[in-house]
């Protein structure tokens, strides 16, 4: 393990692509965990805690490993070399690339537009709630 501290955003992609894995032993319940997503977009497996956003972003045994115990961490770190980095990057790009996220946002905005076509006050006047 080599901790280098903060790095510039320009150097981050190259650094993550060349990393064996990203370790995310956070004690914070991450609501999204951008660091894990960034690593996986580069094809780098993630070894992380098994709560918060990690349960949704790190597919166990495919994109990395989620850990409960010290032994889980040891096993996960030792097993990352068995994961296919191209598969990790492909799945991550399908889920979190700008294009993929943009399509989901577009769908949500279109749904909101349809729902509130007559304005925000329409629901209030009909007694409906959002």
Question: Model segments located where?
Answer:
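Nucleotide-activated donor-binding/catalytic signature segment of Leloir-type glycosyltransferases, i.e.
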Residues: 1-10
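A charged, aromatic-enriched C-terminal amphipathic alpha-helix characteristic of glycosyltransferases
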Residues: 82-129
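C-terminal "capping" alpha-helix adjacent to the active site of nucleotide-linked donor transferases
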Residues: 65-86
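Short glycine/acidic-rich beta->alpha loop that forms part of the nucleotide-sugar donor binding site
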Residues: 30-33, 40, 50
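Acidic donor-binding loop of glycosyltransferase active sites
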Residues: 17-31
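Short hydrophobic beta-strand element within catalytic cores of glycosyltransferases
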Residues: 45-48
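Short acidic/histidine- and often glycine-rich active-site loop of Leloir-type glycosyltransferases
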Residues: 50-61, 65-66
């Amino acid at each position: 393990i080599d901790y280098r501290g903060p790095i510039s955003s320009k150097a981050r992609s190259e650094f993550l692509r060349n990393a064996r894995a990203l370790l995310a032993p956070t004690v914070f319940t991450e609501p999204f965990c951008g660091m894990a997503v960034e690593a996986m977009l580069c094809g780098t497996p993630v070894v992380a805690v098994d709560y918060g956003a990690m349960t949704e972003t790190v597919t166990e045994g495919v994109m990395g490993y989620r850990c409960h115990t010290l032994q889980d961490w040891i096993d996960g770190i030792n097993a990352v070399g068995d994961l296919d980095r191209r598969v990790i990057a492909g799945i991550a790009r399908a889920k979190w690339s700008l294009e993929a996220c943009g399509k989901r946002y577009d769908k949500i905005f279109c749904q909101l537009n349809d729902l509130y076509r007559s304005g925000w006050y329409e629901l209030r006047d009909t007694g409906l709630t959002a």
